[in-house]
């Protein structure tokens, strides 16, 4: 057995060192160095870096970072991603040769991160498979496929009238506090038992509001299949600006591997305001409503990344649900019209409907899905064909009925049907319906099963329909999930099951003891005299 002596180990190390030195090429390395000319409001004007490209990541003195937003002949308008207090005029700046990147991979699911992928949930470092640039080109036409597969939201009104397909971009728009985020979160919750990875990005919102969103998903959904990207109102404008692009990149990782992803952007109105702020600070010429001229291109290149890929590219999909806020219902403002023209449809929320306690408060007349109808389940399409027309006619007749009584039997029947439609589509939060539940309810509605029932029984029927169909619906649910269609026999079985449920609810309501009368003022306990 040969023993290794200290001298032999030293000789081996010396040989390796000589080989390394032989490959070395000593010499000075040139590195472009710039300086900060001026810094204020999260923007630094940098000079001395002529070779920096647009959106390139810049390293500032003190290991701070920013990116190049505007390029002039002599200066760069850099947006700071970190605290600007440590950066002063004269600070050294170097280019990194890379654009801003974000970590991606399954290790991000279940985590709360900032737009740079840094953890915000106190659960340690994020384990990523790779890092990808936040700005990536959208798939070309050759790489895309038709949007032909539904993305179920569990919301009856949306799935029936404004169906969303996987790979679609559907705008959710309305005034402040009308339930825009609630619809998006319900859509995320409904993916609990599906194969869809959800990414929720909050831009410029309060931490308490985002905490409520995360808590709702943890209570009702599958947080282990969600990624939460958060740029709070206290974060730098740069972090808020890159937030939706980071979320898109995180979702694209799953799409490019043949999986399905859903991105909720909450919201693009604040993102547009952030872009306007940065553009004005970097002295970009303002346009309509003081927005820079590239605001349309900014959101177009972001939302174009949502797509259904062809089978040759893996067949994955990325569905986008951007949210936008209107002012006093003005859909003709600059940002709303831009987003409506970019997306494949819009769900418009109405303040009056919300005040009337209708949830979701969707304006049926102004909402549309230009793509999702082709992806809707045929069975659901068959039973929802007249729903929109019947409901629209009811709303018009209801308005006229306030000025006088309705005497014609046909008109009375339309009002009766419309009242039951409204009761059926008024759906509380976190109560998603399965496709088979929706088909059964709408089929029974079309058959007139609910016409003779009191309107106040419809919520109870909607709540109990899932359990009742599991017991009496046969294998219709499994067939619907596999094929999207039902034959006449299966459809009749579902309608019969709902009819039985309606009769049971009516019987239970008739035999229930009446509510005790309200106590009069004299019978109420009086407070003690002082």
From Swiss-Prot:
Q: What is its main location?
A: membrane
Asked if the Swiss-Prot or TrEMBL record annotates the protein with the keyword Ubl conjugation, the reply is no
Residues the record marks as site: Required for activity: 367
Where is the stretch described as Disordered?
507-530
GO terms assigned for molecular function:
ADP binding; ATP binding; proton-transporting ATP synthase activity, rotational mechanism
Q: Where is the protein found, in the record's own terms?
A: Cell inner membrane
What keywords would UniProt list here?
ATP synthesis, ATP-binding, Cell inner membrane, Cell membrane, CF(1), Hydrogen ion transport, Ion transport, Membrane, Nucleotide-binding, Translocase, Transport
Low complexity bias (residue ranges): 507-522
Q: Does the keyword Cell inner membrane apply?
A: yes
Look up the EC number in the record and give it. 7.1.2.2
Note the topology in the membrane. Answer: Peripheral membrane protein
* Catalytic reaction annotation: ATP + H2O + 4 H(+)(in) = ADP + phosphate + 5 H(+)(out)
Q: Which residue positions does the secretion signal occupy?
A: none
Instruction: Kindly provide the name given to this protein in its UniProt entry.
Output: ATP synthase subunit alpha 3
Q: Which organism is it from?
A: Paraburkholderia xenovorans (strain LB400)
């Amino acid at each position: 057995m040969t023993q290794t002596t200290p001298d032999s180990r030293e000789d081996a190390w010396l040989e390796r060192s000589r080989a390394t030195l032989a490959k070395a090429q000593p010499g000075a390395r040139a590195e472009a160095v710039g300086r900060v000319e001026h810094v204020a409001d999260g923007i630094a004007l940098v000079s001395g870096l002529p070779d920096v490209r647009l959106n390139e990541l810049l390293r500032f003195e003190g290991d701070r970072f920013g990116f190049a937003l505007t390029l002039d002949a002599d200066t760069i308008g850099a947006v700071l991603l970190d605290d600007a207090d440590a950066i002063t005029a004269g600070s050294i700046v170097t280019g990194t040769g890379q654009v801003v990147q974000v970590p991606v991979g399954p290790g991000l699911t279940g985590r709360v991160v900032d737009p740079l992928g840094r953890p915000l949930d106190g659960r340690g470092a994020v384990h990523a498979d790779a890092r990808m640039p936040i700005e990536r080109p959208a798939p070309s036409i050759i790489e895309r496929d038709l949007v032909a597969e539904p993305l179920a939201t569990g919301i009856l009104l949306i799935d029936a009238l404004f169906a969303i397909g996987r790979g679609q971009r559907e705008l959710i728009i309305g005034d402040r506090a009308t339930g825009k985020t609630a619809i998006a979160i319900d859509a995320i919750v409904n993916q609990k038992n599906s194969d869809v990875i959800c990414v929720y990005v909050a831009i410029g919102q309060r931490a308490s509001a985002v905490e409520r969103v995360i808590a709702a998903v943890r209570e009702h959904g599958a947080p282990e299949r969600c990624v939460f990207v958060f740029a709070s109102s206290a974060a730098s404008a740069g972090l808020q600006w890159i937030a939706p692009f980071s979320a898109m990149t995180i979702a694209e990782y799953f799409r490019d591997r043949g999986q399905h992803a859903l991105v909720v952007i909450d919201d693009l109105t604040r993102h547009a305001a952030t872009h306007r702020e940065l553009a004005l600070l970097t002295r970009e010429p303002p346009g309509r409503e003081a927005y820079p001229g590239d605001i349309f291109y900014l959101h177009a290149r972001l939302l174009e990344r949502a797509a259904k890929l062809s089978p040759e590219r893996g067949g994955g999909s990325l569905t986008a649900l951007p949210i936008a806020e209107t002012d006093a219902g003005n859909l003709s403002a600059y940002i709303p019209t831009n987003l409506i023209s970019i997306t494949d449809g819009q769900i418009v929320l109405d303040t009056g409907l919300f005040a009337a306690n209708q949830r979701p408060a969707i304006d049926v007349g102004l909402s549309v899905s230009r793509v999702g109808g082709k992806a809707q389940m045929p069975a659901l399409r068959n039973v929802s064909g007249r729903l929109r027309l019947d409901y629209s006619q009811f709303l018009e007749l209801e308005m006229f009925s306030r000025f006088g009584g309705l005497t014609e039997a046909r008109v009375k029947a339309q009002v009766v049907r419309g009242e039951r439609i409204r009761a059926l589509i008024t759906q509380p939060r976190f109560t998603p319906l399965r496709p088979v539940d929706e088909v059964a309810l709408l089929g029974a509605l079309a058959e007139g099963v609910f016409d003779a029932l009191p309107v106040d029984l419809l919520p109870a029927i909607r709540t109990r329909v899932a359990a009742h169909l599991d017991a009496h619906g046969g294998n219709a649910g499994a067939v619907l999930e596999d094929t999207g269609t039902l034959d006449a026999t299966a459809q009749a079985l579902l309608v019969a099951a709902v009819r039985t449920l309606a009769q049971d609810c009516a019987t239970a309501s008739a035999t229930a003891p009446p509510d005790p009368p309200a106590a009069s003022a004299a019978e109420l306990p009086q407070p003690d005299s002082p």
